[in-house]
Amino acid sequence: MSTPSEPYQSEHLASEPPRASVDAAPGRVLLEFGAPWCGHCIAAQPALQHLLAGRDGVRHVKVEDGAGRPLGRSFRIKLGPTVVLTRGGLAQVGLVGRVSLLD
């Protein structure tokens, strides 16, 4: 899994990383599952960008999710947007659905 130059990643990855790569990543990884056409996913971006500002120790991985996508299924993702914060491959916290700066 490559390290982005900034904590916030504005585009979905062309292909999702394998679960083993996420599990082996050092430090914390914020996985964002959604789709570029999803209204709630788009609306969540300012809150996620604000959350990640100044947090160089967190990698943001934006994954387009859908039926048959193995990474999303491995975390039991059913609805977008869903964010999962992992450390050492273990989910530390997750948030499902609409997110705003007021949350």
Spans of model-derived segments:
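A short glycine-leucine-enriched loop at secondary-structure breakpoints
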Residues: 74-78
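Typically the conserved alpha-helix immediately C-terminal to a functionally engaged Cys/Sec
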Residues: 40-54
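N-terminal leader/targeting and pre-domain segments
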Residues: 1-28
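Thiol-based oxidoreductase modules, predominantly thioredoxin-like and allied folds used
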Residues: 13, 33, 56-70
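Short hydrophobic/charged patches on amphipathic alpha-helices used for structural packing
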Residues: 19-20, 69-72
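The canonical Cys-X-X-Cys-His
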Residues: 38-41, 83
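Short pre-active-site segment immediately N-terminal to redox-active cysteine/selenocysteine motifs
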Residues: 34-37, 79
